[in-house]
Amino acid sequence: SQWERYVVDEDVEIHVKRPLSHVKNRRVDALIQEARRLLKETSQ
């Protein structure tokens, strides 16, 4: 397994241990999108 790093904002990262199941992969993708949306919303 290996870790992947996703930069959500300049000060926020999400680290994910791969591989994931298809279901968990979809949930992590949704989590990252929502985190980016929330942080973008608060920076305006």
Regions found by a protein language model. Name each.
Residues 1-44:
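Amphipathic alpha-helical "stalk" segments
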